[in-house]
Every structure is written in structure tokens, then in C-alpha cells.
Amino acid sequence: MSLLITWPDSDPTTPARETSDPAEISSALGGIGCQFQRRELRSDLAAGADPDAVLSAYRDVVDELVAAEGFVFVDVAGLRPTDRPGWSDTAREIRAKFIDEHTHGDDDEVRFMVRGSGVFYLHIGAWVHAIYSRAGDLLGVPQGTTHWFDTGPVPDFTAIRFFHDPNGWVSVLTGSDISGRFPDFEAVRARARSLDAV
């Protein structure tokens, strides 16, 4: 299940809000200018599908969002655990690429998670919002929003990414160390799983 946890940015130990209800997540994120939707998944998409197959399977979603939002570049990002030599190094590099707080300057952050999971953290005002995002979640964050993404130590996700910038993913680091002070992927995922088991 998806999960939203909100903390004061000065206290990562005391959540001010926690919900796994998609409607509540959508409402809470909508209140801070973000978008959250649950979308239908394609059951016939192979687990190891390449980017072209992923885009083809979700062509209707891609076309809808491109038409509505004017995106000019769409790609697929992700990683799947393998026993291939060097995979652990790649996993560390992928996690490190996204885990420091950053913005995307003059572009939005729009991601449709089609497989696996990850945690998006939004630092807006005096609050940090962690969204445990799983397959079927569409998350949209306005340009200039400070955020980070934790793939976990064993990244296992596939996401379709949408851009207004034809250069695709370009980050601007804030220089803050805040991401290291908040519960990481493993902690947030464990909380989501504990709630799911209730």
C-alpha cells in the first residue's frame, strides 16, 4: 500500500500525519500543490520489460498526460536486482544520484511508478512529506519543490518520467544534509508493511 508520513522538518521522530488512504493522500498533497493518483496497472507487462515495452503498455496514460500538461520528453527509469557483475555498484550509484535534496529548477517532477517501490520526500515550508510510492502511483510535484528520492539499498522499481525540459532529468542540489536526518526507505517501507498487516 502507499503511505504518506509528514513530520516537522525540525523533528524526524514525531510524525504529524500518517495515512495510507489514497483519497487522504491525494487531498493532503493537493493542499500543498502536489498531485497524487492511483492508476490501473497492466497485468500483461513482463517483469523485465524494456523501456519501449513499458511505454507501449502505458501509451494511453503517456498520451493523456502529454496532451494535458505539454510534456516534451518522456522516459523510463528504474533498476531490477540481478546477479550481473557490477550490479551492486550500479545500485549504490542510482541511490546516491537521487538521495540528496534537490530541485529541478524550472521543471515539474512527474513520475508514474509502474513496478516496485520507492520513497519520495517533499520538503515544503517547515514540513517533510514522505510518500511510500508503489506500483500504480502517479505523483506530480511543481517546479522548484525541494525533494529527494530513496530507492533503498536494493533498488527495485520502474517509473515513467515526464518532462517539460527536452534534456530530461536535470537536478539542482540544495546543499542541505536534511535527507540524512529522516527515516530512510527501509524504515518507511517497514512502517507501510506493518500497517498493511493490521
Specify the residue positions occupied by each region the protein language model found:
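Short Gly/Pro-enriched loop/turn and capping motifs at secondary-structure junctions
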Residues: 11-13, 118-119, 127, 146-147, ...
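N-terminal leader/capping segments at the start of a protein or of a new domain
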Residues: 1-71
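Double-stranded beta-helix
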Residues: 152-198
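A short secondary-structure junction signal
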Residues: 122-132, 151-152, 171-173
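Short, conserved beta-strand element in jelly-roll/cupin
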Residues: 103-124
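A short glycine-rich, His/Asp/Glu-containing loop-to-beta-strand
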Residues: 38, 62-108
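Conserved metal-binding segment of the jelly-roll/cupin
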Residues: 133-153
